[in-house]
Amino acid sequence: MNWTRRQFNRAAALGAGAGLVTGARAQLSTRKLGYCVVGLGRISMQHFMPATKTSQYARVTAIVSGHRDKAERMAAEYGVPAKNIYSYDNYNGIAGNPDIDAVYIGLPNSMHAEYSIRAAQAGKHVLCEKPMAATVDEAQAMDDACRKANRKLMIAYRCHFEPAHMRAFQLIRDGKLGKIEAIDSAFGFNIAPGEWRLKRALAGGGPLMDVGIYCLNACRHLTGEEPVEIKGYSSVVDRDGRFQEVEENVSWSMKFPSGAVASCSTTYGASMTSYFRVLGSKAELIVEPAFAYDGQRLKAKIAGEAPIDEPSTLRDPGCFVRQADHFAECVFSNREPGPNGAEGLKDMKLMAAIYRG
């Protein structure tokens, strides 16, 4: 897992305007990576696309949507020519478009694999939202397709580019917390009826696939280890009709090779909760809220030092900007992005294990 920590540090440097290798810097100074945004849902329209407005190295050059009117409206806002508006029926046409370097997949989970694989086959790099896919097999197929096509694949774990998260990893790497003994984390909210996330055919699962994955991924990176034991439980409490196809609550525990343990929960039936807490042999650290789009706050009590209380000063769309720019830098410098397809696949396999109980 050491490579991922180096990538966190590199991402932090990129956010500060540094960290580009010489060859990449020359290319980035003269061009931007052209993204084709696939799917005009909430995360695309409210977060990723606005981030490109302040990005140094990324821009929206094409749009794929099943709603022509919405696509035309967004195209006008982002300077996308009419010839670069696609439907899902003519998606393969992106292959011959030199304006498109990469795709950003902001679709429901069950559509990630198909449109990522087709993009790779069209010669485009892929930045795909988490979770990587709806199943382990689909995720593996995505990774295989991108490797076969020699295209970059990055999974959009935006929190890897969030300042409080990067600061937490830095404190751990510097030994400020000592040995990690235990972690607890939770992320959940009360979901509205009718959300596509409540449909198994679209989501692949419930809150674990949607927001619990943040807790899982954070624990792996906070420890720098892969769990050797994992146990999960799921339940439905609210019998109001929302949870006919997916679970309402999931809790799971993990044990790591060092002996560190983790306890995590995720829900679609409770008020908003979002945090992770790390208990170390020398200090305690908590980030709360941890996984929201902005407003993260890190607190730490380190023996012999003044308490740390750091609210995030870089607000949304900052993490999306750094994420888009990091992927562009990796494409231009021919470096492996972090987190890549292999990283997304690990989380998919662990979530499958949690569901198995």
Predicted stretch roles:
Residues 2-3, 7-29, 102, 329-357:
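C-terminal helix-rich "cap/oligomerization" subdomain common to oxidoreductases
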Residues 83-89:
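Conserved SAM-binding strand-loop segment of SAM-dependent methyltransferases
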Residues 217-294, 321-335, 352-353:
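Contiguous beta-strand/loop segments that form the cofactor/metal-binding neighborhood of enzyme cores
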Residues 289-357:
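C-terminal active-site/capping subdomain that shapes the small-molecule cofactor and substrate pocket
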